[in-house]
Amino acid sequence: MTPPENRPSLPEVHRSIRVPNSNSFWRKMLAYAGPGYLVSVGYIDPGNWATDIAGGSKFGYTLLTVILLSNLMAILLQSLCVRLGVATGRDLAQACRDYFSPKVSFCLWVLCEIAIAACDLAELLGSAIALQLLFVIPLIWGVCITALDVLVLLFLQHKGFRYTEALVIMLVATVGICFTAEILFSRPDMGGILLGYLPKKEILQNPEMLYIAIGILGATVMPHNLYLHSSIVQTRDWQPTTEKRWEAIKFGTIDSTFALSLALFINSAILIVSAATFHFSGNQNVAEIQDAYKLLSPLLGVSAASAIFGIALLASGQSSTLTATLAGQIVMEGFLQFRLPSWLRRLITRLLAIIPALITIILFGENSTSSLIVLSQVILSLQLPFAVIPLVMFTSNRRLMGEFVNPLWLKSLAWLVAIVIVGLNAWLLLQSLWGWLLQVPS
């Protein structure tokens, strides 16, 4: 690993938030709280909605176990991001550039940009669908309107990183409150929910169930979040001593674990509401977010249910677009040492998402959008190994991490998660290839 010579990750906000010299746990927790919520946004974005709604309406509570396992994997991987960022002062993209050859780093950068484009596509479509449902705006116009969120991001960056964190926390809280109400409206079967969290082998045996399960994995554990988190933990201005680094790792891990637990509740709630409202009323093919919106109020008998659903979807889409931009900036600067103005970076990211979205809407109609969102989540899942494996490698490398290296139990768990992710992706590819071969005329 070459000694780090380049400037810090996200230099405009690097060490911009003061950590108090206080023995108060809560004062320090408040200072460190924030990055975890920016990361949690990626776990409740519209991509999760599409996969959770499809999974709940078709298979009831069965796929709750996938949401739980995916979230536990996410908590583990995000804790490694905190460890890497605090211990080395490098984000994951910078560490990859230092460790791998230029060709390998370039390939990893391309794969990561594809993942960010897929993620942004889901967020863009989710926000556009929400605008259409709430204000009867044509989907094509909604897609174009969401590109204007670049102005919000530029304003927040000018005000300071804490303002970005505050807005995102407010939007995440909005989604959480909305789905608490939806669960109360849907009156789900608590026994069925508890059984849904138990693993079932039929998930691996049913190709359609496996496809949605891996879509949930891709929607939950997102590759760009690993790059994002390893960078934004460095916004806190802790003293560069061993003791303070351990403290930063501890509080950063608590922050992300709590935030991702909230994301687990929201993801579970989306699937539970879908299962309770659609699956058990005979509507087992509700795959479109628009259909879910239209059916919620009639089936639940609560006129506000659909509007609350739409508000939560808009909050989810808008919050996740903010973090995708930051991730794109971190990835480009880290891998290529190439910096673009944030407005230009946002515009490029948006165009990469707008073009396939508009083409799909024009060619296949507005009802194809949720299928495109689910596909984007499967693409994200296929990119995961290329971010997870380097992360586990680096945090298990004693020469790089020093005394902050993963202990044996954490290293073993991390490699197990990496193997599970690679194995599930390989299984999906084999299933898809086999299905394609069966359809080819002999």
Swiss-Prot record:
The keyword Cell inner membrane applies. GO terms for cellular component: plasma membrane. Its main location: membrane. It comes from the Bacteria. Keywords: Cell inner membrane, Cell membrane, Ion transport, Membrane, Plasmid, Symport, Transmembrane, Transmembrane helix, Transport. PANTHER family: NATURAL RESISTANCE-ASSOCIATED MACROPHAGE PROTEIN 2, SOLUTE CARRIER PROTEIN FAMILY 11 MEMBER. One of its GO terms (molecular function) is symporter activity. The keyword Transmembrane applies. It is found in: Cell inner membrane. It is a multi-pass membrane protein. H(+)-stimulated, divalent metal cation uptake system. One of its GO terms (biological process) is iron ion transmembrane transport. Belongs to the NRAMP family. Pfam families: Nramp. InterPro entries: NRAMP_fam. This is Divalent metal cation transporter MntH. The chain crosses the membrane at residues 29-49, 62-82, 106-126, 135-155, 166-186, 209-229, 258-278, 295-315, 347-367, 372-392, 413-433.
